[in-house]
Amino acid sequence: MLFGGCLRSSLMEALRLILERGSLSGAGDELDGRGFFLRAAESGEPLRWQDPLLSEVGAQVIRVAGTSYRSAELGDPGFEPGNPLALVREPDNPHDANAIAVWNDERTAQAGYVPANVAAVLAGFEELCALSLWEWRDSTGDRIGLRALVYPEGTVRVPRLR
């Protein structure tokens, strides 16, 4: 399944990914949760979230910053792992001229921001895309954190979910 225009590549050498459903518990805050692991479609090999294959095409897996300030909005079903996300640049942001807000695809709920150090790197790319990959929930089942795949348009294709 392809999501929106962001996943239709016009580049010959787009990185093709498989999203593999999974969950972890007891591994520590950075990993505990549920969502999708990444695999390279051509080799079938698993990719780490900091894998060089991702960075070669300008893609990064990020932990969305500022989610603790938006706990009510994080409950929006648009943030479920596997859903496309909208990235909205905020050049007039008083804290960071490179700020990139992370919204659900309908732009009705904001989860937070791309971390400032990553937003600075992505500033050179004209069009950006994102896909929700991983979520953390508290003991009551409320979503409290989100990890996303962020990439320049046309560099990544996600052909199927497992």
Predicted features and spans:
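Conserved active-site motif detector
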Residues: 1-162
